[in-house]
Amino acid sequence: MSKGILGKKVGMTQIFTDNGELIPVTVIEATPNTVLQVKSVETDGYEATQVGFDTLREVLTNKPAKGHAAKANTTPKRFVREFKGLEGAEVGAEITVDTFAAGDVVDVTGTSKGKGFQGPIKRHGQSRGPMAHGSRYHRRPGSMGPVAANKVPKGKKLAGRMGNKRVTVQNLVIAQVLPEKNVILVKGNVPGAKKSLIVVKSAIKAK
């Protein structure tokens, strides 16, 4: 059975194992999620479980959102996402961090930090040209292709907006689960800035 929960990235820290090994971990705060809707093939054309996280201030809500949340006997949520494969979920039920356990392999999805408009060296990791005084090629994008084509080829790595993309890191291992604090500690780093939305779900390519 697949598992999933929504949370917020708190930051990074480090923990030590019993034999003294240091492990860098990301702290994810996941207060209880509420099941807002259970979709089925008969009514929606596909099966999924809609989950809400983080209460939204009433001044920012509208009547449709309030009515949708009222069906689950809860308040409108700031973040609403769908999971596939959450069997046995019922409308109004809560999903807590203790559905996961230490050692579980998960995929973590977040929105990467936006870096603004950047050149090809920072954005794509290209090498720079000679920095000598006579060189006319320092941090430029390089060749645009042959003359005969008379156009820039598709997929050419150029300058542009960097970051602020949906990124998924696969096969991360949960180091610890702290139910009393609604916290999950995941080995390694995950995409996104502090306080950004994080989606944690069972790994689809777990070995």
UniProtKB/Swiss-Prot annotation:
Keywords (A to Z) from UniProt: Ribonucleoprotein, Ribosomal protein, RNA-binding, rRNA-binding
InterPro entries: Ribosomal_uL3, Ribosomal_uL3_bac/org-type, Ribosomal_uL3_CS, Transl_B-barrel_sf
Region Disordered: start-end pairs: 113-151
Record-linked Gene3D superfamilies: 3.30.160.810, Translation factors
SUPFAM superfamilies, per database record: Translation proteins
A Pfam short name: Ribosomal_L3
Highest taxon above the source species: Bacteria
Signal peptide from the UniProt entry: none
HAMAP family recorded: Ribosomal_uL3_B
Subunit structure: Part of the 50S ribosomal subunit. Forms a cluster with proteins L14 and L19.
Function in brief: One of the primary rRNA binding proteins, it binds directly near the 3'-end of the 23S rRNA, where it nucleates assembly of the 50S subunit.
Name used for this protein in its record: Large ribosomal subunit protein uL3
Source organism (scientific name): Lactococcus lactis subsp. cremoris (strain MG1363)
